[in-house]
């Protein structure tokens, strides 16, 4: 990614050993050497959040929360301001109340503040955050502590017009995952579909958006390096 000239990136950690300081500091050096900035961190443990953070078994929460403290510390070392959280699935075996969910999320927010990072709710299909109404209630509950990662493809998968979601949360969005689409395909490299990126950039500029944009697509079936190079050139040509 850095070799292609990208100046903004997200680090997706893949295992706990990558959270150790020597590894994280090497990542930071790699970014600095290329004049790039790490905007965000994505935990590898997103699939476990339902059972280990947003569930009532306290001992499991106590044992697991340290992993997120390490992610927040790693984000701080990288200079990243955002940590991406999926949260709980939409239907849990033991469904917790929204207030319980919001309180647990608030506990993550407080840990993030100690490292100077925003703990952000991403909109994700099949998770509670797939619902705009849920996100509105979360915003009301958390107030100024509510920060959001907006994902274009996830908005589509949740059944929404991405521009509706972006407009509703434009003042709370601190980070954006970009992808292209067509009526038939919901996730494509930017420039390969019909999504109106210029409209999105204009909307966020008008809202005085200070966050960044990263491309998030799934690599299966793509010549990744060539597609990223193409998408970078395409997006650079239309950014306002």
Q: Where on the chain are the PLM-derived regions?
A:
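Short acidic/polar active-site loop segments enriched in Thr and Asp
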Residues: 7, 37, 81, 174, ...
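Active-site acidic/histidine proton-transfer and metal-coordination neighborhood
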Residues: 50-147
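Conserved radical SAM core fold
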Residues: 45-50, 90-92, 180-185
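Acidic/histidine-rich catalytic cores of soluble enzymes
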Residues: 8-9, 41, 107-197
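Charged helix-capping and loop-helix junction motifs
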Residues: 22-26, 61, 65-68, 97-106, ...
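Short acidic/histidine-rich active-site segments
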Residues: 212-217
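Acidic-and-aromatic substrate-binding clefts and catalytic sites of carbohydrate-active enzymes
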Residues: 12-26, 90-96, 126-131, 152-160, ...
């Amino acid at each position: 990614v850095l070799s292609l000239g990208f100046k903004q990136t997200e680090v997706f950690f893949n295992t706990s050993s990558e959270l150790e300081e020597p590894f994280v500091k090497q990542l930071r050096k790699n970014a600095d050497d290329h004049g790039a900035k790490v905007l965000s961190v994505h935990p590898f443990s997103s699939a476990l959040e339902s059972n280990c953070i947003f569930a009532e078994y306290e001992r499991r929460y106590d044992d697991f929360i340290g992993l997120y403290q390490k992610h927040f510390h790693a984000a701080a070392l990288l200079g990243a301001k955002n940590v991406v959280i999926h949260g709980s699935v939409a239907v849990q075996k033991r469904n917790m109340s929204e207030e319980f969910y919001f309180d647990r999320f608030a506990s993550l927010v407080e840990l993030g503040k100690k490292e100077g990072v925003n703990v952000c709710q991403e909109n994700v299909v099949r998770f509670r955050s797939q619902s705009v109404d849920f996100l509105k209630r979360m915003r009301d509950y958390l107030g100024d502590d509510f920060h959001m990662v907006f994902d274009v493809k996830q908005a589509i998968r949740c059944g929404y017009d991405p521009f509706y979601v972006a407009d509703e949360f434009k003042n709370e969005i601190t980070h954006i995952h970009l992808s292209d689409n067509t009526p038939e395909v919901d996730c494509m490299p930017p420039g390969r579909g019909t999504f109106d990126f210029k409209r999105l950039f204009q909307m966020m500029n008008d809202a005085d958006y200070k966050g960044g944009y990263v491309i998030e697509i799934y690599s299966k079936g793509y010549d990744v390096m060539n597609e990223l190079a193409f998408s970078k050139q395409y997006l650079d040509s239309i950014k306002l």
